[in-house]
């Protein structure tokens, strides 16, 4: 089961990258639970798949328009066979718009964040129950 689950989770991560790179908010939210929780890099919290998708429409048409996304899985921990924590480092590349001052990122440099995904397996599918993202300053 673990090897299968590892591959399925890696596939979910690959799907997130591909959806970001296409600026496809619907696909980016596809495996986000209907009642999932999203905390963005500003510390704002939102509930539900529809809101997660709506927020990413803003992301893909705003300051991160045209960017590319890299995700590096640092650690995958199974809390139970059907619950996993995925600790990732993200990099947003190709930023061409000035970021708010809260980000200490020179124009053109990648934005780095730490992302914790809480994943729940239901009906043979891994779902994102929690998406908690924090800005890395260095």
Give the predicted meaning of each segment.
Residues 33:
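Helix-to-beta-strand junctions that scaffold the AdoMet/dcAdoMet cofactor pocket
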